[in-house]
Regions:
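Hinge/cleft segment of the Venus flytrap/periplasmic-binding protein
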Residues: 36-50, 203-206, 295-344
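Short, solvent-exposed amphipathic alpha-helices that sit
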Residues: 63-78, 161-165, 190-210, 225, ...
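Hydrophobic alpha-helical
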Residues: 109-110, 114-130, 199, 214, ...
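Hydrophobic alpha-helical segments within soluble ligand-binding/sensing domains
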Residues: 46-47, 95, 152-179, 194, ...
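Flexible loop/hinge segments that line or gate small-molecule binding clefts
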Residues: 118-119, 124-160, 171, 276-289, ...
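Extracytoplasmic "Venus flytrap"
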Residues: 38-71, 75, 79, 84-101, ...
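Short, low-complexity disordered leader/linker segments with a strong preference
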Residues: 1-51, 126-131, 343-344
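Short beta-strand elements in bilobed, periplasmic/extracellular small-molecule ligand-binding domains
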Residues: 77-89, 180-182, 203-223
Length: 344
């Protein structure tokens, strides 16, 4: 990558700065719709005048989405926000339709999953800004939208997280050039896919061979649908050493994948992202070996808090990288109780 900074890059950066300043000014103006506090003690329901829609991403009973929603619900209770949690079954088109409805209803603030990407979200973010609706984002960062219209991001740096997971797997498991990996990547949406694709890149740079299988995000709503997909991929690549899963909802069925393909405990490495009660059980039984924790509870709690603070206090948006390191066979017991409680 060249270190030279071209005129085009400079102009693009100056445009981003200009848009960021404009978005900040619009956020400050948006606070005028909410009564200003009259003292330093905000009280128990200090955000009760703020009507908010918060997007949890997946199905209401979903593992990852359930933890995100738990974080949001705790923040709603702590702030008194007048908030509704929206579930989308990881259907990005549904997210866009629901967002359009949220804007049409004229809510004060929206905590939005960034999965639909810049192109889909940009016109709706513009509408929200024109109506004075605050927006912030969680789990996937629509960086172009935020550069233009403002808003914070609470979630992991996806590309960095995926590459770090692959490097840790190489270190822990002694993977070497020529070893084979299967990586499930949500190919249709690179804003979301960059995490798993980052793992692929690191493996290939290490000299490993990688088979990519398409990970439609909708699989997360019914994870058992991926079992025959992985079974077929493993049958076609019997020397596979390691599988990379695209999230906790899929990795929840790691034991089923291994057994369906004829593997016993610890006979094939399975790694991925996030924790859950099922993943803790899979660690115990030898079917999951490494995961990168992105603290989904914070991805629910902090966006609600951020929107309340901006609406009531005029503060800037919260930006937080929630990546928290690795859970593996040596340390999973330290987080098991929280994972079993649906908090990690």
């Amino acid at each position: 990558i060249s270190n030279r900074y071209s005129k085009t890059n400079w102009e693009g950066t100056m445009k981003s700065i200009k848009y960021g300043l404009a978005a900040l000014f619009s956020l400050q103006l948006a606070t005028t719709a909410v009564a200003a506090p009259t003292g330093q003690d905000l009280g128990a329901n200090w955000c009760s005048d703020v009507k908010m829609h918060f997007y949890a991403g997946g199905p209401e009973a979903g593992g990852f989405a359930g933890i995100v929603a738990a974080g949001a619900m705790n923040a709603i209770r702590d702030t008194g926000a007048d908030a509704e949690i929206i579930y989308s079954e990881w259907d990005f088109e549904k997210m866009v339709r629901q967002l359009r409805e949220s804007i049409g209803l004229g809510v004060d603030a929206i905590g939005m999953m960034g999965h639909p990407g810049d192109d889909a979200l940009m016109p709706l973010a513009k509408q929200a800004a024109e109506k004075g609706i605050l927006m912030t984002y969680q789990n996937v960062d629509p960086a172009g939208v935020r550069a233009r219209f403002g808003g914070g991001y609470v979630g992991a740096n996806l590309a960095t997280q995926g590459k770090a997971l692959a490097r840790e797997a190489i270190r822990q498991f002694g993977l070497k050039a020529g070893d084979h990996a299967i990586v499930m990547v949500p190919i249709g949406d690179y804003a979301r896919a960059q995490r798993e694709d980052g793992a692929r890149i690191v493996f290939e740079e290490h000299g490993m061979t990688v088979t990519v299988v398409d990970g439609n995000p909708a699989y997360a709503s019914d994870p058992n649908t991926v079992i025959p997909i992985f079974t077929a991929a493993l049958s076609a690549n019997p020397k596979t050493k390691i599988i990379v899963h695209p999230g906790s909802d899929i990795m929840n069925v790691a034991e089923g994948i291994a057994k369906a393909a004829g593997y016993g405990p610890n006979e094939i490495l399975q790694i991925g992202f996030d924790t859950s009660p099922q993943i803790m059980t899979a660690f115990e039984k030898g079917y999951v070996h490494l995961t990168s924790d992105q603290q989904p509870f914070l991805q629910g709690y902090l966006p609600v808090l951020s929107l309340c603070q901006t609406a009531v206090l005029g503060t800037g948006a919260i930006n937080q990288d929630t990546g928290a390191g690795f859970v593996d066979t040596n340390n999973y017991k330290a987080v098991k109780a929280l994972a079993d409680a649906g908090l990690r």
